[in-house]
Amino acid sequence: MSRGLGDVYKRQSKDCPSFGGVYKLAAIQNKDGEFVPKIKISENIEKITNPGNKTIYRIYDKDTGKIRADLICFADETYDTSEDLLLFDPNSTWKKTRLEGGTYTMKEILKPIFIRGECKYTSPSVKEIASFCEQEKNTLWDETKRLFNPHKVYVDLSQRLYDTKTELLNNVNR
C-alpha cells in the first residue's frame, strides 16, 4: 500500500484532517515544451487542484490602493486594466463582481525562484521583508484585518482556467 503525505497526517490527527502546502502535480511539459494541464480530484471541493502552468495577479482598487481580489490564471494570460473585468467565485459561480475598466490596477505577485534549475531570485533582507509586509498590510481593508468576523480576500480563477478545470473534471472516468 502506498500513502501520500496527506494520508498519513489525515490518519494521525482528527483535529487537523488535512495538510496544506503539499506539492501537487498541475501540468506535464510535453516534447514540444507545452504544458499539458493535469488535475487532482478530491471529495472536498477546495482541495481540487487548479490545473496548468499558472500565475497570480493581485487586483487593487485604483482610488484607494486596497486589495479587491487575487486572480489565478494561466501564465500566458494577460489583462488590460482599461477593460472591464468579470470576477466570480469558482465554487459559487453565481457570485460575480464586474470591475469597470480604469477603476483597478493589477500586479503579478508570483515570482520565479528557479528557472531550469538556476536560482533567479535574490532573497531580500529582513528589514526589506518587514517593510514589504507593512506596505502590503496597508492594502488590506479594515474589514479584512479585524479579528472578529473578518471579510476575506477573494481568490478567483480566470474564465479560461475555470473552463479548463471544468473540462478536466467532466472528462474523469471517460
Predicted features and spans:
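Gly/Ser/Thr/Ala-enriched C-terminal appendages of enzymes
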Residues: 10-174
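Single conserved hydrophobic/aromatic residue that forms the stacking wall/gate
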Residues: 1-9
